[in-house]
Amino acid sequence: QLFYDGHQQLAVQLSNLVKAHPACPPSDRLFKVVKFGLESEEELSGSKKIEQNIAPGSGIDLEYETDVQSISPEGALYETCYVTAHKGPCRAGAFHSSGKLIATGSEDASIKILDVDRMLAKSATPAEIIAMETPQQAMENHPVIRTLYDHIDEVTCLDFHPTHSILASGSTDYSIRFFEYSKPSVKKAYKSIQEAAPVRCLSFHPSGDFLLVGADHPTVRLYDVNTFQCFVGRNPSTHHTLPVTTVKWSPNANLYATGSLDGDIKVWDGVSNLVISTFKKAHDGEEVCSVTFSRNSKYVLSCGKDSLVKLWELSTNRCLIVYTGAGMTGKMQHGAQAVFNHTEDYIFFPDENTTSLCCWDSRNAERQRLLALGHNGAVRYIGHSPTGPAFITCSEDFRARFWYRKADTD
């Protein structure tokens, strides 16, 4: 309760004093117990209310959780299964909602789509067997299933349509392009939207009918994917004051979140397009690099160029947990992302200076072991599979690495 109420130092001291194991996450359970106790003194129906409030959802939910055992692997247990190379720095990536496909984008203006099952099969096949493959077999088994060329400048962001075989891409060439990747022969986009500024970020609505776009401009765009009509919020005074750097829909589609160079995080109503809350100077005024929602849409996870990762509770509009220990040598030069793993037990964040993966227990901010990411340059993108223990890292060293936690064989 102390942790939840913002008394982080007191909570840690008390936790150390009573030797709490595992460490206690922030929770308002004590407040709720007292509240229900007072209610039950007045009416006997209080116990029914408690029962109705105990059903836990999947993923992180600090409102109901007490002692949750992590069943998924920490970051240090993953290993590289496949590496693909571009001809320039690789700074964009995306995971399909099925967890079966990955896309990577580069400064060389190309996009690759990779098959996860093929990458896993390739890593499990002995080199001598791969050497014996015919050219036809090699092509059929190759993890890169599509290479798309239609941008004329750096690919900055990617997102898969949730239900159709469509990939959306944004670029510094001022365009958003839509690729139909189910046809092997197609390398060009079937539709292009010309923007007024370089495109920085985009996010598909969970239905796939709308696309959020952030460009080198303070105004967030919302495109109808069927008509390609553009909408913007009708109250400019509440918008960002500097270019938008990150956009993300909530899984329940009721909200979306944005971050900006102005240092603010804004949460918007997904229907009215109006700002409903603003976290001012969310990262001490530094640029906000990423925002993402928890699966139950109750929390926003963010990171900024102050090298801090924060969990925000939307019901109270405040920062609930700060994950510290990354970027010990100072502020970040490049942007990166903080992501949940597939079970939301852990939070992954690439440390720019050490090129290693920082990992925390999402509920109590306990630092886990570091994982060396093996890149020869800063990691510019990290994305975790929504369905299994796998993630992708894209780097300034022109490479994208696919990581997977292999099941124990003993």
Task: State where each predicted segment sits.
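Loop/turn segments within WD40 beta-propeller blades
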Residues: G93-G99, L158-H164, L202-D209, K248-N254, ...
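Conserved strand-to-loop turn within each blade of WD40 beta-propeller repeats
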Residues: G105-D108, G170-D173, G214-H217, G259-D262, ...
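Eukaryotic adaptor/scaffold assembly regions
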Residues: Q1-Y82
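Canonical WD40 repeat/beta-propeller blade segments in eukaryotic WD-repeat proteins
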Residues: G88-A94, D153-D159, A196-F204, T241-W249, ...
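Per-blade loop-tip surfaces of WD-repeat and WD-like beta-propellers in eukaryotic adaptors/scaffolds
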Residues: Q69-Y78, I113-I145, I152, H164, ...
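Beta-strand-rich domains and repeat architectures in extracellular enzymes and scaffolds
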Residues: V83-A109
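Eukaryotic modular interaction domains in large regulatory/scaffold proteins
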Residues: E287, M328-G383
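Blade-level signature of beta-propeller repeat domains, shared across WD40, Kelch, NHL, RCC1
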Residues: R380-D410
